[in-house]
Amino acid sequence: NSVFILNKIGFDKLNESEKYYPFKLDFYSISCNKICDLDLTPFNSANDKYTTLKRSTLTKFLKEKLLSDSIIFNKKINEVKQKNGKIDIHFVDGSSDKVDYLMVSDGVFSNSKSIIEKKFFKQNYYGAIAIRTQINNLDILNLNINNISIIMGSNAHLVLYPINQKKELNLVCIVRKKLEENN
């Protein structure tokens, strides 16, 4: 994950009560029978741990820590090159910029990943909707609220994970709807 980079701008100083460090990733069937788990601790170092938190907490942190002139909005990337330890970004409008780090967060249907990686990525999100909410951990039965839980079904999957030390949970549900053919 990107904690190593975020720590360079002070993420490690963020209030510990606003972060959570899950130990495992648990996989369940749609009927909540546990299939297996993955230990996340081997991916951690002393300073860089697998971390979950509220999206709003991360957004606020980034807005406070990054200079407003270092965030570029509403630009389409045309080309990305690395030269002498810097990243040279060329935009569709003819402008360009040199940066140390490039973070792109423009959605799953963006072509930025294809441009940066210099290969085509086909999106596989047809006929799906995503629902996101936060819930109280008391609402969850039979799941380990200390871990990230993935519940998998044939047309849906749910991901639950703690987002702070109060163990409030994020719930993300992806549902694929089979489209009926018109006769």
Regions found by a protein language model. Give the residues of each.
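Conserved N-terminal helical subregion
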Residues: 3-134, 178-183
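Generic detector of short alpha-helix boundary/capping microenvironments
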Residues: 20, 119, 141-143, 148
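A short, acidic/glycine-rich surface segment
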Residues: 114-116, 139-143, 158-159
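Short beta-strand-to-loop capping motifs
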Residues: 133-139, 173-175
